[in-house]
Amino acid sequence: MPFLLAIDQGTTSSRAIVFDHEGQPIARAQKDLVQYFPGDGWVEHDATAIWEDSLAVAREALDRADVAAHAISAIGLTNQRETAVLWERASGQPVHNAIVWQDRRTAALCRELKAQGHEALVRRKTGLLIDPYFSATKIGWMLDHDPVLRRRAEAGELAFGTVESWLLYKLTGGAVHASDATNAARTLLFDIRANRWDEDLLALFRIPAALLPRVVDNAGRFGETLPGLFGAPIPITGMAGDQHAAMVGQGCFTRGMIKSTYGTGAFALLNIGQTFVESRNQLLTTLAYRLNGQSTYALEGSIFVAGAAVQWLRDGLRAISSAAETQVLAEAVADTGGCYMVPAFTGLGAPYWDPEARGAILGLTRDTSLEQVARAALEAQGYQTRDLLDAMAADSGTKPLALRVDGGMVANDWVCQFLADITGIAVERPRVIETTALGAAALAGLGAGVFASPADLGGQWHRDRLFTPHMPASRRESLYAGWVQAVRRVASDLR
């Protein structure tokens, strides 16, 4: 029986899952990743830890599955997107901590570039906005703050990659420097219509072309692991950014299908087919996936803080000891008593794009309880999702009939039901909620010939539970109106 190994490198942890050829998880391993916060709004990772942890969990998953390397048909890689890694080609060692997608240190530069009128060019070529979220200004910051690094980059001595590119480089012993199209599309340097690195964008952000990896499809033969890593070489045949892998894992291969993933942040992607559509409502246009050289596009809404709000209750306030407690707390009260949490810890994402916004809990009274604050943290995920779905409906002209959800938060039944209630559409939770890893494994299977076509991948999806809206429309709109007012008080551009 062929097995597939998915390595899923995320913002707060690295995990690996062994799947069988029917898409069922056989064994998994996970290790938390330390985050560093060296300045206000700054977020970094140790790139060496990313590599070492990813290798360790892959080995552990194989051990737990009792599967030898020669029985693994292929490896699929998926990763936190936009996070920028810079390393020395000769040694394979990082020259700076990885700057994480959440990092806002380049907000002033982004404002300056917008004021100079560059955003129209960026939107036309990349489908993105000028924002610290994306990789280009992170790379530029590293080069500008160490003149030696800029000189070495221009001389071709350094390499840039998003996390999947970094892992591919390390797994192959430096033999392959490549990035998949979905990750390249998140850098602000890649023209997603022409499918190439763009000279105008490289000049705008002052990024030397010598840094850049070769761009490949999401499925194909990219290289193989060094024999010593797992006991035998394993082909690496699938790569995608985490949200794109989740789209594959959710079987969203038809125009109009939509998925939303709830992890540290939350990300909704709507399949819009093979025609580029520029958003009029502050969404991103991005690659859903690229197979056999053919691009499929998506509208994306990015929420910077989802599960991180619950982590803050646990680790920051120490109000709870585990994320699972939030469901019990939320169910213990009938409502939040007018309390809203706007979790803009690192600014607001779509559709506001306000890097200066900061989080707030509004509507507090002497009677506000921990249960109500916990419920407000969970409700915020529904309100933010409603923001995105309304913008998508305005751009596409149609409202989706169902929302496929995944990620750690959707194990919480209360969250899924509130999502259905506040959006007014059905919410579908799959049997395998680790759909990011499943999508990476499926792409690896496609690249290795285990699956013949994307249609075979869609057959891997099975529904666990359907949540339908129960909330009266008047109540839904009243709650959402309160959210809109809360955001208005937090967002710097709306005050």
UniProtKB/Swiss-Prot annotation:
Q: Which residues are ATP-binding?
A: T11, T12, S13, T264, G307, Q311, G408
The record's CDD domains line, in alphabetical order, gives: FGGY_EcGK_like (cd07786)
Entry annotated with the keyword Cytoplasm: no
Q: Which residues bind glycerol?
A: R81, E82, Y133, D242, Q243
Question: Which Gene Ontology cellular component terms are annotated?
Answer: cytosol
Q: Keyword ATP-binding on this protein?
A: yes
Transmembrane annotation, as ranges: none
Binding residue positions for ADP: T11, R15, T264, G307, G408, N412
A molecular function (GO) held by this record is: ATP binding
Q: Which keywords accompany this UniProt record?
A: ATP-binding, Glycerol metabolism, Kinase, Nucleotide-binding, Transferase
Give the pathway.
Answer: Polyol metabolism; glycerol degradation via glycerol kinase pathway; sn-glycerol 3-phosphate from glycerol: step 1/1
Superkingdom assignment: Bacteria
What regulation of activity is recorded for this protein?
A: Inhibited by fructose 1,6-bisphosphate (FBP).
Q: Where does sn-glycerol 3-phosphate bind?
A: T11, R81, E82, Y133, D242
- Look up the record and give one Gene Ontology term from the biological process aspect: glycerol catabolic process
Q: Which reaction does it catalyse?
A: glycerol + ATP = sn-glycerol 3-phosphate + ADP + H(+)
Q: What is its EC number?
A: 2.7.1.30
Q: What does this protein do?
A: Key enzyme in the regulation of glycerol uptake and metabolism. Catalyzes the phosphorylation of glycerol to yield sn-glycerol 3-phosphate.
- PANTHER family, per the entry: GLYCEROL KINASE (PTHR10196:SF78), SUGAR KINASE (PTHR10196)
Q: Which family does it belong to?
A: Belongs to the FGGY kinase family.
Q: Under which name does UniProt file this protein? A: Glycerol kinase
Q: Please name the source species.
A: Rhodospirillum rubrum (strain ATCC 11170 / ATH 1.1.1 / DSM 467 / LMG 4362 / NCIMB 8255 / S1)
Its taxonomic path starts at: Bacteria, Pseudomonadati, Pseudomonadota, Alphaproteobacteria, Rhodospirillales
What gene is this protein a product of? Answer: glpK
